[in-house]
């Protein structure tokens, strides 16, 4: 088995973590039922391009799936800037992914927490 790739720092539940510390449980709703939603955003000169439109689309996807997305556009913008600074990059591809954990059960995952 190959070595796990190290992506440095990531942002989970409002906090910066080491990529190696990120864990998605094997029984998480998103892994079991492919119920995650994500948005890919390009950043140039340390500014995410059309961030407001990307986040509006992400929120709509979360609404359709019944996921909770508790962060404001400002909080996400600050997190993006913080991570780009930590990685010393100005141009980047940012992926925001919302998953449901393993705190609930059932096909719809209504009791599961969004992460």
Give, region by region, the residue ranges found by the protein language model:
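Conserved alpha/beta cores of soluble small-molecule-handling proteins
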Residues: 1-115
